[in-house]
């Protein structure tokens, strides 16, 4: 198998970007979907509900994450600031994630027009693949890797 393109999505449902190389982990590409926008109860929200999410452009920095969006000042957060445990839910799977500074929550809430917060999966994911509990999973819907063939893409 040969990969023709490789995409990275640091924040679930936000814009992704193309990579030329990546580190493959048991949980997926390193840093992929390790951040998630959630409502006040910790339940994930997606671009299906809030289409403006796809306009948010995340970027990985040496110390954390940078977010950019139209007509907004960029904001950066540090991994080290995510120390507050937060119950979170992706579909029906409940597990612990981490919450950080309210400034980024306010930034996201203002841009999306709804009360929300940014959660981080942490260095050791508490979420495990349902079909194999030895494999960690990030905030991805259910699989660490998603592949699509060129022909299937052309059919879309």
What do the PLM-derived regions correspond to, one by one?
Residues 1-156:
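Small-residue-enriched flexible connectors and coil-helix boundary/helix-cap motifs
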